[in-house]
């Protein structure tokens, strides 16, 4: 049967002024208190994407992983874990290449995932009158991630911008604001990532520096260099602390310091802190007994410090700072520097497991230490959630 195809170009909203860049308009809305919430999105290590919705006072309204997409159809609920699905497909493709078999396509799964994630975020933006904050990751990061099949990062940004460029809520009447005949433009026209800058309408970019490693309660972040170089530099490191003492009542060691004695990076911010060897940290290492594979162990920090001091012949109830600075043996000082690194390591993960948590070495005003495992819904409940939360707060 002969067929004729008649292609007709359609211009949407042809009466509009054609404003491609709406950045100034969005900034004006923000100045006039038109924005009520902020959405932070973290491209996490354990999650494809993690979302944190906060109000303008920094309170968490909602936090959720975007690994799992839940849909309802005819009264039934269907959940799909796209992280596991993509990982499984990657393994199958690797095996197929190795055995010269047909390689399954992964592109459709990625596109399906992106479409659903973009729908969730755009709907939330309109519902909560929110702007979206993303990490400003360099192009090298994106290209590096593309070596992995789960690299949904660059495609996600582009899809979100294009979706928000002409947003229609199909659940609304066509005459309502946001309906078919009154679509919303929430981003500027996408040209390229190089031209994107720090803003595209209601989409903003903030520096990616340490967002997942900032204590969400106290704001503490590790600015130390704890790499062991030699005896002299290790002694100089400990000499910069204001005080190093053992708290017998709490059974932990305290390291009081002023960041100005170590670095200029904390200038114009809070500089006086006290580190406490509270709780445990996870040490990750190559295990010779397991063919040099990655392994991990949980370290009780206070106990480890006590053992080092005991071997060095140091009385923990005495002047610890002077005693440490008087040490001459590499073995003791190197071990102390390694323990300092663990003390400052707020993100703790075990390879090839779901163990991934945040614990702070700094107490808040009530004497409590942030621990993401405590189940406090008012705080981030895992390391990637903490990243999304701090990204939103930076916005």
What is each of the regions a protein language model found here?
Residues 1-395:
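Positively charged, helix-rich recognition surfaces that bind polyanionic ligands
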């Amino acid at each position: 049967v002969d067929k004729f195809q008649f292609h007709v170009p359609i211009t949407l909203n042809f009466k509009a002024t054609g404003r491609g860049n709406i950045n100034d308009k969005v900034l004006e809305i923000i100045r006039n208190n038109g924005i009520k919430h902020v959405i932070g999105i973290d491209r996490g290590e354990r999650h494809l994407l993690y979302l944190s919705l906060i109000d303008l006072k920094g309170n968490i309204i909602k936090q959720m992983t975007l690994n799992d997409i839940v849909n309802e159809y005819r009264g039934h609920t269907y959940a799909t874990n796209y992280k596991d699905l993509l990982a499984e497909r990657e393994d199958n493709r690797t095996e197929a290449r190795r055995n010269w078999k047909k390689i399954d396509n992964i592109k459709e799964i990625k596109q399906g995932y992106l479409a659903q994630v973009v729908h969730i975020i755009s709907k939330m933006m309109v519902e909560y009158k929110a702007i979206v904050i993303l990490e400003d990751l360099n192009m090298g990061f994106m290209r590096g991630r593309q070596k992995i099949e789960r690299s949904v990062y660059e495609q996600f940004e582009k899809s979100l911008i294009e979706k928000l460029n002409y947003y229609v809520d199909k659940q609304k009447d066509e005459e309502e604001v946001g309906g078919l005949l009154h679509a919303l433009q929430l981003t500027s026209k996408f040209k390229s990532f190089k031209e994107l800058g720090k803003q595209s309408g209601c989409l903003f970019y903030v520096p990616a520096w340490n967002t997942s490693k900032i204590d969400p309660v106290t704001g503490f972040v590790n600015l130390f260099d704890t790499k062991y170089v030699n005896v002299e530099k290790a002694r100089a490191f400990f000499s910069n602390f204001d005080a190093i003492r053992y708290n017998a009542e709490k059974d932990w060691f305290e390291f009081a310091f002023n960041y100005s004695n170590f670095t200029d990076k904390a200038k114009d911010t809070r500089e006086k802190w006290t580190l406490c060897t509270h709780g445990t940290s996870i040490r990750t290492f190559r295990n010779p007994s397991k063919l040099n594979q990655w392994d991990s162990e949980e370290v009780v920090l206070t106990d480890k410090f006590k053992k080092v001091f005991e071997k060095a012949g140091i009385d923990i109830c005495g002047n610890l700072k002077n005693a440490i600075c008087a040490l001459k043996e590499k073995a003791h000082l190197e071990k102390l520097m390694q323990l300092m690194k663990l003390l400052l390591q707020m993100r703790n993960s075990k390879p090839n497991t779901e163990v991934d948590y945040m614990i702070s070495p700094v107490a808040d005003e009530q004497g409590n230490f942030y621990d993401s495992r405590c189940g406090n819904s008012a705080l981030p409940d895992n390391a990637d959630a903490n990243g999304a939360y701090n990204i939103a707060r930076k916005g």
